[in-house]
Amino acid sequence: MRVVLQRSKKASVAVDGEIVGQIPFGLTLLVGITHEDTEKDATYIAEKIANLRIFEDESGKMNHSVLDVEGQVLSISQFTLYGDCRKGRRPNFMDAAKPDYAERLYDFFNEEVRKQGLHVETGKFGAMMDVSLINDGPVTLIVESK
């Protein structure tokens, strides 16, 4: 499992011009799932993200988690995170999980994030989405389970 995490001042996702998920501040997650991922990977990533200390304290040090600052999470599925661009000029997506499997694991992942005590908004799995955010910092990390 691969997640691109962005600390966000605000974020939203729209499908067909209609906002389907939005947060006032917190973390925007682009979530990629490969065919080798399991529920164990999803739980590991959910716990890691909830507890990563990437928000500043009073002295400007990254000492607070999204839980500490009472932020929210916008989670967006993105199979293209498993695009392999090493050969040719068109990405190969063979490492991305099949949609049925990926959707089930993506839903499980979001529930695991909620179990950490976070409010989670989502995009629409498999849809073309317009994502808008103000990246805070910018702080952008890649979190992987393997």
From Swiss-Prot:
One of its GO terms (molecular function) is tRNA binding. Its main location: cytoplasm. Its EC number is 3.1.1.96. GO terms for biological process: D-amino acid catabolic process. Pfam families: Tyr_Deacylase. It catalyses: glycyl-tRNA(Ala) + H2O = tRNA(Ala) + glycine + H(+); a D-aminoacyl-tRNA + H2O = a tRNA + a D-alpha-amino acid + H(+). Keywords: Cytoplasm, Hydrolase, RNA-binding, tRNA-binding. PANTHER family: D-AMINOACYL-TRNA DEACYLASE 1, D-TYROSYL-TRNA TYR DEACYLASE. A Gly-cisPro motif from one monomer fits into the active site of the other monomer to allow specific chiral rejection of L-amino acids. This is D-aminoacyl-tRNA deacylase. It comes from Bacillus cereus (strain B4264). The lineage of its organism: Bacteria, Bacillati, Bacillota, Bacilli, Bacillales. The gene is dtd.
